[in-house]
C-alpha cells in the first residue's frame, strides 16, 4: 500500500485567487499578482527573461550577490547591460541611478534588490522609483528579503515587477513566492519574442 507524501487536495483556481488577493493586500497593490509554483528564484529569473531581450538595454544595480546574478541572466538574454556597482557595505542612491540613466538614455529595464540578505543593506526604492519612472524604464524589484521586514509599496514606488518570497523575514516555507505585475510589464512580457 502506498500513501501520498502530502495528502492535501490540490488548490483550486478559487483558492489561488483568494491567496493572490491577500498577497495584493500585503503589497498594497492594484496590479495583478501571480503565484508561481516554485521558490523566488523562479519568478526573479522569469521577470528578467521576460523583460529583457536582444536589443534592450538594462541598468543592473549591483549591491550584493543577487545583483551579480541578475547581470548574468540579463546578459544571457542578449540584453546590453550597464552595471551600477556599489560597495557591498553601502546602499545605492537615487542620484547614482539617475546619473546612470542620464549617461545611458537607451536603458529600458532596471533591476534592483530592495534588501540584500547577504549584506544587510536596504536600498531606497521609493526615491529610486521616482527616477526610474521619470526615465520611463520598466522597473523590476527583488523584495524577497524585504517583504515583512521593510515597508514595501510597489504601486506607490512605480515598481512594475515586484518579486517576493516567504522564506526570509516572513518566516514561511521555502518554495513559496509571488510577483506583482503592472499593465506595462504585461505588455513588455507579451511583446518578448522568446
Please provide the spans of the model-predicted regions.
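A glycine-/small-polar-enriched, mobile loop at the entrance of the PLP active site in fold-type I
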Residues: 1-37, 41
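Conserved PLP-enzyme active-site core in the AAT-like
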Residues: 2, 9-11, 30, 42-194
Amino acid at each position: 500500500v502506498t500513501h501520498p507524501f502530502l495528502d492535501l487536495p490540490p488548490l483550486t483556481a478559487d483558492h489561488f485567487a483568494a491567496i493572490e488577493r491577500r498577497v495584493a493586500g500585503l503589497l498594497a497593490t492594484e496590479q495583478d499578482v501571480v503565484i508561481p509554483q516554485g521558490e523566488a528564484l523562479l519568478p526573479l529569473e522569469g521577470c528578467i527573461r521576460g523583460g529583457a531581450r536582444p536589443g534592450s538595454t538594462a541598468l543592473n544595480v549591483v549591491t550584493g550577490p543577487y545583483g551579480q546574478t541578475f547581470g548574468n541572466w540579463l546578459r544571457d538574454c542578449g540584453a546590453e547591460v550597464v552595471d551600477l556597482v556599489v560597495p557591498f557595505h553601502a546602499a545605492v542612491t537615487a542620484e547614482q541611478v539617475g546619473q546612470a540613466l542620464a549617461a545611458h538614455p537607451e536603458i529600458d529595464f532596471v533591476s534592483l534588490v530592495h534588501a540584500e540578505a547577504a549584506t544587510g543593506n536596504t536600498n531606497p526604492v521609493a526615491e529610486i522609483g521616482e527616477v526610474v519612472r521619470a526615465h520611463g524604464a520598466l522597473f523590476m524589484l527583488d523584495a524577497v528579503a524585504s517583504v515583512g521586514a521593510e515597508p514595501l509599496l510597489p504601486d506607490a514606488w512605480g515598481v512594475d515587477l515586484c518579486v517576493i518570497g516567504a522564506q526570509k523575514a516572513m518566516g514561511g516555507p521555502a518554495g513559496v513566492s509571488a510577483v506583482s505585475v503592472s499593465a506595462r510589464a504585461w505588455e513588455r512580457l507579451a511583446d518578448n519574442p522568446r
